[in-house]
Swiss-Prot record:
The lineage of its organism: Bacteria, Pseudomonadati, Pseudomonadota, Gammaproteobacteria, Alteromonadales. Pfam families: DAO (PF01266). The gene is mnmC. This is tRNA 5-methylaminomethyl-2-thiouridine biosynthesis bifunctional protein MnmC. One of its GO terms (molecular function) is tRNA (5-methylaminomethyl-2-thiouridylate)(34)-methyltransferase activity. It comes from the Bacteria. InterPro entries: FAD-dep_OxRdtase, FAD/NAD-bd_sf, SAM-dependent_MTases_sf, tRNA_MAMT_biosynth_bifunc_MnmC, tRNA_S-uridine_synth_MnmC_C. One of its GO terms (biological process) is methylation. It catalyses: 5-aminomethyl-2-thiouridine(34) in tRNA + S-adenosyl-L-methionine = 5-methylaminomethyl-2-thiouridine(34) in tRNA + S-adenosyl-L-homocysteine + H(+). Catalyzes the last two steps in the biosynthesis of 5-methylaminomethyl-2-thiouridine (mnm(5)s(2)U) at the wobble position (U34) in tRNA. Catalyzes the FAD-dependent demodification of cmnm(5)s(2)U34 to nm(5)s(2)U34, followed by the transfer of a methyl group from S-adenosyl-L-methionine to nm(5)s(2)U34, to form mnm(5)s(2)U34.
């Protein structure tokens, strides 16, 4: 069963409001829009001093009604399929910066009411793909991936200057061209244009329709060449109605480089990967769960080969081995970096699941080789279970104007209707959430990766030692030695700290027992995931999942009758006097035990492995007395933090790995291949495996 859909009254903006915030460009006819897109693509090859290789990155200032984006994606899709253009097999990344977040419901309303797609029916398929990806009205970047990674769209919603200034630049793949939409051109100022320049190649061009002279001057003053397209483009070829001005001022280009250097220095405590590997040189991954599987997929979408070393005989035998797991975002009253990251990550994971599920259902030979993922986006209903938890939940609900697609408050009657069983208390409903089978998710990701790149999996291969020799990593298992690998990722869950190189990572294992209870009587009618003191899923293959225990430093990982009873007790405490609770039968002693690796701040760990010994040695050197405290702070703020070159960490997913793991893997894959990231600096700092030490050192505190 599936929960009732969210209420339409949750959406507050009507068409007149939307068309005011997201107006169409001056080029409104199908011909003029196509001409503009062809012009943009042709300029990529004629303006650039370097050939387009691997990845083309384009920027867009404003979303408008979205037609410019749709036209670009449609043309790129068509041309890469026919391979008649210079970009050939090159992938496309479009980074759109829009101050006013919009969701799929409002986008559809905008397109339907304006009838803008009626005369542009060739854009309808890509428009449908955007809508299916369900962009949400949240602050931050949402990464949308299409065509097995050949097309990627980053929607940066929120304050424009913050979005630009907090975005890391990727030296190997800077933005090659900008399109400035008319309705936001007037908002451009010098600080914003210089941040655009920091993120762009030296020969990047800024294109606009009827650009004002002030905008062109701002662009020229930061080293941009400009291309001003006239509205007359609707009458013919765009090249007949444009003004182009090329700027080659070495001083301005030097200023760009200084901006990049300043940004790197300011974020030195969050180091970047040092070197890229050739695509045929595999990235080594130790693991076998959801994190490592999604990393393989993200790498494969970039054409990067990888080799997995898994200690079990198949994927998903660790923490990813549960029959069902809840997937929904972690929200905080402050909507801080943690909350915003989990919203971005949850939506990304949801798109991954839908894309992989679609791949497994296609009537092709390759589809037969992609594992089907059992899942149901039936929503998640969160309620309090005692006075303290209810106060905490109320604070989350009342502290922010949450987008309805993320979560909205429901009263007791609405909760009953959503759950289809008696709840009789108010709650918070996450309409896009639900449950998914983690090990099938992992298998489907690796299946898909194997279709896109050279992927190898070594099962029953427990890595017992890793060593670095001559800037390369070697792995040891039962007398075998694997390597050399220039890049090694440890994504091995509960075994993350088993190697000396990472044994001091500040992360803890927690045992979790999930009970399997038969679907029967009223309990079988449950239509959404319940989260209170513990969680309960709708039935799958005749069983519900009830959990989970949370035991630190567990002495064993066998079935525990006491934890089985405690899981039941949590539901009894959460929903007292409800008849369906009596239908929960744990007498079969059916359960599964796993180990979750948890960090104190609830962020996963993703990035370069810290050289803890070197950090501590430098700490002793720079923290000799109180007078040197300020000097020490400056040192750690401006000096690249010590790392173990070529070694990376992907773990600490805790109990929310289904939400956080895929985006963390995507970001690490982007780092390993030198590509632009969908996360900003503040979030990357929170994810960095060295953060527990550097957080104190940056404040001049003792370790």
């Amino acid at each position: 069963m599936t929960a009732k859909p969210q209420k339409s009254c949750q959406f507050k903006r009507d068409y007149p409001q939307l068309i005011n915030l997201y107006p169409p460009c001056a080029l409104t006819t199908a011909q003029s829009l196509d001409n503009l897109t062809r012009l943009r693509l042709s300029r990529l090859t004629t303006q650039s001093t370097q050939p387009i290789q691997g990845l083309c990155v384009m920027g867009q200032w404003g979303l408008g009604d979205g037609l410019e984006l749709l036209s670009l994606l449609q043309h790129w899709q068509t041309q890469t399929q026919t391979q008649t253009q210079p970009q050939g097999n090159t992938r496309l990344l479009v980074k759109v910066f829009e101050p006013n977040p919009i969701n799929d419901y409002e986008l559809k309303l905008l397109w339907d009411q304006s009838q803008s797609l009626i005369s542009k029916s060739h854009l309808q398929p890509i428009a449908n793909a955007i809508l299916k990806a369900k962009p949400a009205r949240i602050i931050g970047c949402q990464r949308l991936i299409f065509d097995d990674g050949r097309i990627t769209v980053d929607l940066h919603f929120g304050d424009l200057h913050s979005a630009l200034s907090q975005l890391p630049h990727s030296p190997a793949h800077l933005i090659q061209q900008w399109l400035v939409l008319p309705h936001l051109a007037a908002q451009l100022n010098g600080k914003q244009v210089w941040q655009m320049a920091r993120l762009s190649t030296d020969d990047a061009q800024l294109i606009g329709v009827n650009l004002a002279e002030t905008v062109r001057q701002l662009a020229h003053q930061s080293g941009f060449s400009t291309l001003n397209v006239s509205q007359d483009t609707s009458n013919g070829d765009a090249s007949d109605a444009l003004q182009s001005q090329i700027i080659t001022d070495e001083i301005l280009l030097h200023e760009r480089k200084l901006l990049r250097q300043q940004a790197d220095t300011a974020q030195a405590f969050t180091p970047k990967p040092a070197a890229l590997v050739a695509k045929d040189h595999p990235v080594a991954i130790v693991g076998g769960g959801l994190a490592s599987a999604n990393l393989m997929l993200s790498l494969a979408e970039r054409g990067q080969s990888s080799t997995l070393f898994c200690k079990d005989n198949e994927l998903g035998q660790g923490a990813s081995g549960n029959r069902q797991g809840a997937i929904y975002p972690l929200l905080t009253p402050e909507n801080d970096e943690l909350s915003r990251f989990f919203q971005q990550a949850f939506l990304f994971s949801r798109r991954r699941i839908e894309a992989l599920s679609h791949a497994s259902m296609m009537e092709t030979e390759t589809a037969k080789n992609v594992t089907a993922i059992s899942h149901d986006f039936c929503g998640v209903l969160q309620t309090g279970h005692d006075e303290r938890s209810q106060q905490r939940l109320d604070k989350i609900i009342q502290s922010q104007d949450w987008p309805a697609e993320i979560a909205y408050a429901v009263d007791a009657n609405e909760a009953n209707e959503i759950a289809q069983i008696g709840i009789d208390k108010a709650g918070f409903f996450y309409p896009l959430g639900g449950w998914v089978c983690p090990f099938e998710y992992a298998k489907a990701a690796v299946d898909k990766a194997s279709q896109l790149a050279n992927v190898q999996c070594h099962f029953n291969t427990e890595i017992t030692e890793i060593e670095c020799d001559a800037n390369a990593w070697y792995l040891h298992s039962q007398g075998q030695r694997f390597g050399p690998f220039r890049q090694l990722v440890l994504a091995n869950g509960a075994q993350l700290t088993q190697f000396s190189a990472c044994e001091r990572l500040q992360i803890s294992p927690f045992r979790g027992q999930v009970s399997h209870v038969p679907a029967q009587f009223k309990l079988s009618q449950l239509a959404t995931v319940l989260c209170a003191n513990g969680y309960l899923t709708p039935s799958h293959q005749g069983l519900h999942c009830l959990g989970a225990s949370y035991v630190k430093a567990a002495e064993h990982f066998d079935f525990c009758p006491q934890e089985q009873r405690e899981n039941l007790g949590k539901m009894q405490e959460s929903y007292p006097n409800q008849a369906w609770v009596d239908d929960i039968d744990i007498s079969g002693n059916s359960a599964r035990v796993g180990v979750r690796m948890v960090t104190r701040d609830h962020f996963p760990m993703m990035g370069c492995a810290p050289d803890v010994a070197e950090i501590l040695a430098r700490y002793e050197l720079h923290q000799l007395n109180q007078q040197q405290a300020e000097q020490s702070k400056h040192y750690w703020q401006t000096t690249p933090a010590p790392i173990l070159d070529g070694l990376y960490i992907l773990g600490g997913l805790g109990s929310r790995g289904l939400s956080s793991g895929p985006l963390a893997a995507e970001c690490l894959a982007a780092q390993l291949t030198g590509e632009p990231l969908p996360l900003d600096w503040p979030t990357l700092n929170k994810l960095n495996p060295n953060r527990m030490w550097l957080r104190k050192l940056l404040k001049g505190k003792a370790l």
